[in-house]
């Protein structure tokens, strides 16, 4: 933790004054600053410490993470530098557990490598985060799904390469069984 303290103080906290957004991974100027910092964190074995080793993380338990997060929580740059930014970390776990091999190659690996950002779209204007009140629906249209509805408070949407969208697919089912998650590339019409 001594190294983390020093790294935060000397390298990351000064960046909080920089005019770059640490979540905009499409910005080449940002990546020129971010990549060397990420390498230092990887070299110390602290990259994505919250994720399991099979996802390239350290599999830290709650106490270890709490001690680390107490320090890294001082800078808005730290989540991008340490590979722990939300919603990317949660989306990585979803993709690792439920994604196809093709989805893992296209979305999970670049996410784990810190090359892209993602977005999780669940909250709705009329229902907040209560899935029992969601109205965004996905219906089959041949081999495709058509999603209709409105999501908001989707963190990092403007920087995301893809969204994971929660939509109602079985409206007659119990609340916890009526939803499905969809990977929606940012270039999809209607986003």
Residue ranges and their predicted role:
Residues 1-86, 97, 102-113, 117, ...:
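Amphipathic, small/basic residue-rich leader segments at the start of a protein or domain
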Residues 54-56, 123-127, 152-153, 168-172:
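Short beta-turn/strand-loop junction motif enriched in small, turn-promoting residues
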Residues 69, 92-95, 108, 164, ...:
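Conserved protein kinase catalytic domain
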Residues 88, 103-105, 126-131, 154-156, ...:
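Short, well-ordered, mixed-charge alpha-helical segments that flank or form enzyme active sites
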Residues 144, 148-191:
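A short core secondary-structure module
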